[in-house]
């Protein structure tokens, strides 16, 4: 229970005595009552009244509790009301519920004072014992002095007046104990002036007293007049008669009876008013309390021990009594008589003033006493708290630490469990999401409603599971009960609380179910709203520091009990209140009992009751179930015959149902079969009609195109059309009559077409009619109209802006080309080159096309000079017809420089404007454009503008404003897609004629050729679906199925293409050109490649790929192509997946570091810079003379003594001693015969073994040579022994060993058997296989002294030692040899270290990947290594083409390893670098290999210096490879060109090559007109292209098995691989992507951009790139990226891939 202290209406609203409660620290101990420090302690209800004898015992004293009560009243009832009392007998208690001290209960009762002041401005409360109700003082026990100081702590020792008068109800006393009414109010004026009743009152002096009426009064008690305290309001005596203070009488006499007062005096309002005032004043007064007397307070008589009463004389007493009697007998009292109002008011004012003064003084004293008391109490509490805290810490610190550690361990376990649960739930969400998506997909594909509903239910279940799992994952649980956590929460039900509960309520222990315990009664809406409003009001009051509005707890039962008790009290006489126990010990025991009951017993009893209730309910439920079963038993008792009858009826019903179902199924099947046959017959008839309609439509389109081609062909070369044998067009005498432009007409025979026939739209033609005459006439009219429109458009090209140009330039102006007539064209004189015969024919064909205003396609094979023919056309127009442009040449980026150079070279008079570069550069170039004049002259700024496809699209708004005379598109396959923005922008340019240059008009399919025809003649070759399908589908299907194409269709196709396309092949027109030989070189997979390939194929399910391909999802197609790319990487080189890394042991060393090499100087000495992490620190003492046994010094006298005497004084090898010995023929006299001087002998004694060996190595062998000088002719050696070398026997006979004398031959082998055998077996070149797991340099000894550093440097960096061991001269010696130009042989001696055993040994254990293994890891690279070795030896030069740029990077490493010179060109090479790289290869014969990417380096460049072409990996498109190999096999090539194609056997590359051969067959059939045969093609159609790619991943056995299953599925009428989706899923496919789109160079969709280029392939800077959305920035390269999943780069569009193909990344 929570809540603050209950404030009633009489409680003052003042601030608490102590500051607001704040939670104690964790280290603060609890108080002994196990409750934390509370700001508002709990309250205690009044105790039970004790028995009267015990309460009135004079020896019984109660120790009052300084704290308020802590328990609520019993049974949750409202606390009993307390009367506000005017006096107090025990100041430690108070009547209100306000706490006196907001502190916890002390340890013992001896600490507190019994007379502490009240914290509020109220009278000090009295003890809970009510008085006995007697009004005389004789009924009280005499006071005991030892009880006056029961509690020694200072306080207000005065006591107040008893509250028994206020507690006891008024009653009528008998005559023997009755007292006058004024005695009940001791503060009244009459009580003060009253005296003994037996004496007569004094008469009044102011006015005569009336005659008193005889009133019977009882004998009063002896008059004891108490002094009036300052805090009380007293009625002043009459001013004329001052009343002295009477002294107590020694004896008490029997009073005389007085006359009874009149009844009207008791009903006076003034008396009641005075009594009311006196009661209020007494309640407000706190001064002059009466000390307790035997625990019972006196009624109203108090006296001070310090005041001595004065005795009055008998005369004074009689006078006073007489006056009192007169006052009592008077009709009105003296104060009620007129004339006393002012005195009365003055009296009231003085009384209030005295009361205020007394109250203020008492308040000051009370505060001082309270402060002293609280200071002492606080110190006592602090001392006890510190002691308790220390005891608690000592007792529980270890257990708390262990508990905290255990809690942390448990929390860590719980956290891990939570993470596991989280992962399981996340997996559940993912799996359920997949199930949901799968169910929704199946539901969308389901045809049956029931099946669809089932799938939807599965999806709904999965969604619910996902929702519940996500809720559990997010931690959302069911709402729990809101537990109150603040100790100051409002108690809206009133009453007091003993404790508050922090945290959530304990979970209910009731069992869920219908048989659970009884639930709480539901509250109405009004009650809930009332509780909510009350809570809001309470919180608002708490925020505003206002008293909380307490709502009494409503309980109907309690209200009824209160009413019954009230009625009973009204009927029965009110008993006398009994005194309750008020001792402190009693209250503590009482509170402890209730606290234990509330904390322990009540929950226990509640649990017992709840368990009993649940058990009882469970038993009742079971009993009810048994009773229900028993009551239903009679229903189960059925007759056996009835059961048998029902069973027979059910069996009969089932049989009947099965019979009729079978019958209906058979009838339904027959009906469906009949309907199916009818539908198939109708479909067949409709298909025949549609086929005839499509045939007529296609025949119309082909006839119209044929007629158009016939007209154009007869105009250009009339004989060619006659030779074609076209039966549909008869020979005619059509001529072109010279004359005016408007007179040009074409004469056709009347049998062919009616000239008056109007042009008919394609949509208005009736293709359902059987008669085709109208269609032929419409085709003839449309063809004639198309020819006329083309010529009119050519004539009117310049007529709009410059109508006078024809008159100014003469009648041969080319603006009217039809006026020229048939002119024989010769080579222009402006052209500096000599055209070949076929090129001159091409020039004539192009000029005739231009004259007729018709566009064309020059499709000569690559290398036959399409560029020079185009340039000759521009030269012819400029020279003959004075047409100087503007001409627009659009080419790939790699050929832009080639166009510029060839135009400048062959036609110097024509000015070329190269239009490329940055946006700023192009803006400057556009200033040379002349948009105002369409006629360009020789003096114009430029004549030909050369640019790339990207820039044309980028600046299309500027190009569209210029009228171009001629637009030449080089490599026109760049516009093979009619849906691309490039195709549409170029088609919108204003130009008179268009010329397309392409060596491969058909690359992947016939649709590309149709796009080119559509571009040159958009009005004729319109995008009709029928024509497009006839072009692509029919012809391709014939090529794929290896069937012969219809001769009529093939002839008509050639008839259509012949007027618009000119194609010559090298072998037909160029005899001097060398042959081209193609060879397929098959390679095998190495062990590493085979492992990679098998692992990849095992991880892929071919059936799953085929099923996904059947669905036709674009994402699945992309994934499939990525998978194909991975297989191609394996075939190329396994290092494309994972490079062999450099290996080294773990180095436990510290490497040298420097902040800047500037500080290190020119030469950085890194020797011994690698140091061990472990350093052995030695003290400087060990390196000084004091710590060394062999170094003399000031601190080492012993070594100095030894050195002095042993090394010098006693040393026989001193020069002086040796000289003396030699002179005296002593022991050293042998030196003269050993060729040794005195100094040499002395040095030999002081040098070490190594120094002597070094010196011995440097001595010349001069003694052994004397034998040659002294030899005689008879081969007898003369006496060549000199005296000074008499003892040098070894030096004189120094003969070389046989090993040195015979450096080669059999003799050397015999002398060096072990060494030669070791070398022959190759043991000296074996690479070490084992390497340590860790390595470290030797432990370094460090010392901080200079001596140690100098000695270490002398040892490590000794120049003579290094020179002797390694035979490396010093830097200074080398410089002197070079400066003096000396022979270095005498200065370079052989090293003293022996030759190492292994030639492959290393100084370190770092293993660099072997390049030899790098070559052998790939079957292709190993074969290429052999091939390049042969080609290098034969003097050939090689063009090496790749699909992947990363493979080019690996090839650079290989060429560097083999020391082959090379250059590189790929898509990232900048434009200027491409030109320089091509020029270097053409001009420098030392460059052996040219590395190129197939797409970027296979277009337009001339590389005739090479005679060998190697394709490391083939392209999807065979025409790309053809273009690449024609870079070498072209005009200018005099040698035979050999083409090698590396193919890995048994892999996907074989199938790709098979597909490429199929495409080549399509080109041969369409372009060359040959028969389709000789190549074995598969029969897979275009719709299953993605499935074909999936089949490439399988081996031959798997492919055969899959084809067999597919055939079986087709026989059953199903779609193989379509899955559960059925035929609808198979038909619902995305737009088919061609193989060229899906794999654009290895640099397009699958460009491996992980390696940075080298050589000439310099990355393009961002400043040179075009900042447009369509531009493709050069990707950053780095190891290990490639096309790995996770790359953030977006997929390239078709436009970007085409741009990358053209190598335009730098524009």
Swiss-Prot record:
Reactions that this protein is recorded to catalyse: ATP + H2O = ADP + phosphate + H(+)
Compositional bias ranges of the Basic and acidic residues kind: 264-284, 426-463, 524-535, 552-572, 633-647, 734-746, 1693-1707
Listed InterPro entries: DBINO, DEXQc_INO80, Helicase_ATP-bd, Helicase_C-like, INO80/SWR1_helicase, P-loop_NTPase, SNF2-like_sf, SNF2/RAD54-like_C
MF GO annotations: ATP binding; ATP hydrolysis activity; ATP-dependent chromatin remodeler activity; DNA binding; histone binding
Coiled-coil regions, chain positions: 395-478, 635-706
Motif (DEAQ box): 970-973
Main location as per UniProt: nucleus
Helicase C-terminal domain boundaries: 1423-1583
Pro residues composition bias: residue spans: 42-55, 209-226, 235-249
Domain (Helicase ATP-binding): residue spans on this chain: 847-1019
A Pfam family reported for this protein in Swiss-Prot or TrEMBL: SNF2-rel_dom
Binding locations of ATP: 860-867
Biased composition, class Basic residues, residue ranges: 1676-1692
Alphabetical UniProt keywords: Activator, ATP-binding, Coiled coil, DNA damage, DNA repair, DNA-binding, Hydrolase, Nucleotide-binding, Nucleus, Transcription, Transcription regulation
Entry's EC annotation: 3.6.4.-
Location relative to the cell: Nucleus
Subunit structure: Component of the INO80 chromatin-remodeling complex.
Function recorded in the entry: ATPase component of the INO80 complex which remodels chromatin by shifting nucleosomes and is involved in DNA repair.
Family: Belongs to the SNF2/RAD54 helicase family.
Protein name: Chromatin-remodeling ATPase INO80
Organism: Aspergillus clavatus (strain ATCC 1007 / CBS 513.65 / DSM 816 / NCTC 3887 / NRRL 1 / QM 1276 / 107)
Gene: ino80
